[in-house]
Every structure is written in C-alpha cells, then in structure tokens.
Amino acid sequence: MHPLAALPDPLDLDSAAAAVRPLRGATFAVAGTPAAQATAAELVALLGGHVVAVADGARPLYHAAAALAANDLVALLQVAEQAAIAAGLTPAQARAGLGHLMQTALDAIRRLPDDAPLRLGLTGAVARGDAATVARHLQALNQHHPPTALLHCLLSAELVELMRDSALGPAALAALDTVLAQVPRPGE
C-alpha cells in the first residue's frame, strides 16, 4: 500500500489518531497477491480512501509524481522563502505569508471539478498574459539566485502550456514564450 498522503515522522506524533488523520480520504496504490490487494482495499475503505491500480513498471513514475506533488512543494517553499527574505520579510513573515498563499492556491485547485482544466485555478502574471511582469520577476530572481530564476522559468513554461487553450490569445502567449526563452539554461 502506498498512500498519496504526506506522513510526518511517527516519532513526532502524539497519538494514533494523529497518525491516521493524513490517511483519511487518501488515494492508495496497492500491489501484491490478489488476497493482499483485497485486504489492502478493505483497509483503504475503512479510511474512506480510494484504491488505484499502478502497474509494476509504472511504479517509479507513480512515486516520482508523488515526490513532485509533496517533496518538491517543500523545495518550492524553501526557494520562495529565500526570495521573500531577500526582499525584506523576516523568516517568520515569509513562512506565514507564503504558506498561507500556497494553502489558498491548493484550496482553489481542490474546489475545481475533477474534469475542469487546472488553468482555472491559476492566478498571477501568466494567467493574465502579463509578459512584462514575468520578465521583471525573472530578472529579480536572476539577480537574487540564478537557479531560482531557472526554476521559475521552467514552471512558468508549464503554466503557459496550461494557458494555450484559454482566452489569452496568440499574441500574449507568444510574448510569454519570448520572455521565458531569454532565461539562460545550463550548458547554453
């Protein structure tokens, strides 16, 4: 059983209830013999969770997707905090403010219907097609920490792809593509 849930170090938990809480409603990939899978499915049902089938050959990709969604989110907060602190926020202000921003962004995405495009949960310069603001952000990040500028560029390029079927229009998308193409990549 592999849950799509962030589980803290069990040594830090105060009770069994706290240990189970993140598992309630989670999606679980199950593997093993048919009997083991049936038992796992019963446990998942008791937790109000959902069972998904993941082929053995696809398991590394499944785990990578989980790492992108959870662990890389921590890395993203780390680099965002560093930029906010460099901009003048205290570490506590950066953590509280950016943590709140991330939570409200996740909440907005989770409120979307399952079949809705993720772009409907997007806010900010890319969603508006504001290439000039994206360019200013990239320039500031490049002065602060070039690897963070590259990270922002690569993630923004994914956001532009999300916006391709939106009402932005070809001129705004082309302007965003042009700005993002100007960020130096390793080896260039």
Q: What residue ranges belong to the model's regions?
A:
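Rossmann-fold dinucleotide-binding core
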Residues: 1-63
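Generic hydrophobic, helix-prone segments enriched in Leu/Val/Ile
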Residues: 23, 62, 102, 152, ...
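Short, well-structured alpha-helical segments
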Residues: 41, 95-99, 153, 177
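Short polybasic/polar patches that bind polyanions
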Residues: 45, 85, 164
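Helical "substrate-binding/catalytic lid" subdomain
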Residues: 57-148
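C-terminal active-site/capping subdomain that shapes the small-molecule cofactor and substrate pocket
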Residues: 116-188
